[in-house]
Amino acid sequence: MKNIADSGILARIRKLAPQSAERAAPFRTPEEWREWQLAEGRRSCEEIDRQNRQARAEKIFGRAGIQRLHRGCSFANYRIQNDGQRHALSQAKSIASELDTGCTNFVFSGNPGTGKNHLAAAIGNRLMNTGRSVIVITVADVMSALHASYDDGKSGEKFLRELCGVDLLVLDEVGVQRETRNEQVTLNQIIDRRTASLRSVGMLTNLNHEALTNLAGQRVMDRMTMNGGRWVNFDWGSWRPNVSYLRAVK
């Protein structure tokens, strides 16, 4: 098959094309044509790889990367009633912007029902809308899936590898179980691998900084500060009494 970049066909196509198409074309020479082909191929491969990572991770847990309850969460529908919530929204938007082009880590700390999951899901939904892979999962589910892989006679290595391969991993309910040593070792493994490969980690917790440091260890907390990692406090009352989900009646 002829390479149109070398055969003169490219020049004839350009001669027949309107001037507006000429201005919009991403290439003007055979060399630029080849570079454009290679770049498009790389983009296509990267997109397929992202989709495969998301699919593999979701297959492990048997569900979508973001739970149904939070799939509609966005920055636009986050309700602001005080300066703390305004600050949390600003921080979440800034985190999402950084994740568009690089990586960063974050910890959202506060009592239940204060909107930590909403803003974490808003970040995740925005990334997923641009083709990135995201998993939001409780530490309890991570530990259960890891134990199940051992019970099935399989190594937990594949499970951890898939978990560490998504673009953004958000660990929810960190500290709820207080499983001490086993949980601490698992958190260390996950966060070490992800930060070493420049993949972002988020944590959602009811614990304050001192309590989380005692649970996760200084090593984990130090790694969470990498790449401009942030700690955001959600120190207001629960919004859940105001939440109502109406189901359609058939």
Where do the model's predicted regions map?
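Pre-Walker A (pre-P-loop) alpha-helix and adjacent loop at the N terminus of AAA/AAA+ ATPase modules
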Residues: 66, 79-106
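Loop/turn-to-beta-strand initiation segments
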Residues: 104, 132-133, 165-169, 197-203, ...
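Conserved catalytic network of the ASCE P-loop NTPase/AAA+ motor domain
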Residues: 98-101, 128, 161-164, 192-197, ...
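Short glycine-rich substrate-engagement loop in P-loop NTPases that contacts/grips substrate
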Residues: 84-92, 103, 128-165, 184
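P-loop NTPase Walker A phosphate-binding motif
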Residues: 118-132
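A short, basic N-terminal segment
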Residues: 1-86, 231-232, 236, 242-250
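Walker A/P-loop nucleotide-binding motif
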Residues: 102-121
